[in-house]
C-alpha cells in the first residue's frame, strides 16, 4: 500500500499541542488525506460520531484526560489508531495499536497508518 491509498481518506488527529498537530496534519494532507483535528477527547468523540475516520493519530494524554476510554470506543467501532505519545509506560495501551514515541517525524506516522490499513485490507482468495 502506498501513500496514494490515503487520498481522500479521513484521518483524525487527536493532539493538544498546536504545532505538533499542524505538523502531523500537513504530513497527511501532503499525501491527499482529509484531516480532522481534535484537541480534547470530548471533541474527538464528536468527530468519530460524525464521520468514521480511516484511522486516528492519538496522543495518550489530552487536555481532558487520558486515552483509555477513547481507545475503548475506537476498538468498539473497529477504527485503527496509532498511539503517538511521549509516555514510555502505557500499561497495555498499545496492545491493539502501533506506538510511535514522541518526538517523531510525521512521515513515520503516515507510514504507520499505511501499515495499519494494509493489515486491515481484505484478502481475496481465488480457488482455481
Can you say where each PLM-predicted feature lies in the sequence?
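Alpha-helical interaction/dimerization surfaces of two-component signaling modules
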Residues: 26-28, 47, 73
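Acidic, metal-coordinating helix/loop segments flanking the phosphotransfer/catalytic sites
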Residues: 37-55
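Conserved phosphotransfer microenvironments
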Residues: 58-75
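Conserved acidic carboxylate
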Residues: 15
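Hydrophobic/aromatic residues positioned on beta-strands within the core alpha/beta folds
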Residues: 84-85
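Two-component/phosphorelay signaling modules centered on CheY-like receiver
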Residues: 18-36
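A Lys-centered signature of the CheY-like receiver
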Residues: 102
Amino acid at each position: 500500500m502506498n501513500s496514494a491509498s490515503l487520498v481522500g481518506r479521513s484521518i483524525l488527529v487527536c493532539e493538544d499541542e498546536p504545532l505538533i498537530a499542524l505538523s502531523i496534519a500537513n504530513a497527511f494532507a501532503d499525501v491527499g488525506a482529509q484531516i480532522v483535528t481534535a484537541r480534547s477527547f470530548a471533541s474527538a468523540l464528536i468527530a468519530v460520531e460524525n464521520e468514521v475516520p480511516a484511522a486516528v493519530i492519538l496522543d495518550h494524554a489530552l487536555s481532558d484526560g487520558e486515552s483509555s476510554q477513547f481507545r475503548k470506543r475506537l476498538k468498539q467501532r473497529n477504527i485503527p489508531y496509532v498511539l503517538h505519545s511521549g509516555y514510555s509506560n502505557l500499561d497495555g495501551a498499545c496492545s491493539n495499536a502501533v506506538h510511535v514515541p514522541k518526538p517523531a517525524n510525521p512521515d513515520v506516522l503516515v507510514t504507520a497508518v499505511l501499515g495499519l490499513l494494509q493489515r486491515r485490507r481484505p484478502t481475496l482468495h481465488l480457488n482455481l
